[in-house]
């Protein structure tokens, strides 16, 4: 029933102040999919549950609903798996940069192997004879190539640099990252402050990064021209921190160092084979250089090349 308070002609409803309760699903997680989500079935319908582990009993809320499946996120863990660990990153529950920090590392590898074997068998119809031991590298600060979103938020008077928040298109406000190169993670707050000071702070949508063991290159995607003071700020920053700035104004052919001192040579080495490969910040390289070295070593041990053989990596 509507009513009109004295002195106010606006109509109100008794239900205006009552927020609808969340519709939570109670689910027992049956297994893990290729994206690290828990999988369950309710009334025959597949539900993919973010943040849930096999064997757990959780309350979850669906946010994507399709005729044949739903995607949900974990609201509360009622019965916890012994493989659940505390995420190392303080931003994990909000930032969408990674999704499995709650899952013990060796258990992650085992789960991924099961998914891989199941895919070979169920989809590829391949019967495996021998399964090699999975390869693994460092679990933290391994991502040496990638892209960060940038957004200047007027209300905060602050430039955000990072990944999208989980389940939104907004950029997560983070001060560090456990998967980025350590040098980049360490300077994230200062980098955000630097972007905030630029005259074109609202004209920089993204930053691509490329790193090796000795250098970190940040390629600023700029939609307007940097003025003299902007260049001074960037040059001063790179002289005080282990970073070199490059810019990209249009297509890939416009990528260039901000100044001659930023024109560094990136490289990665395969020391046991006496090889060192140089690459540019915009070249394709493996995101994880550590696992790449292990892969090459494994491939060479399986190939058993003679001294006259030549091996090509395509």
Model-flagged regions — what are they?
Residues 4-314:
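Accessory RNA-recognition modules of RNA-modification enzymes
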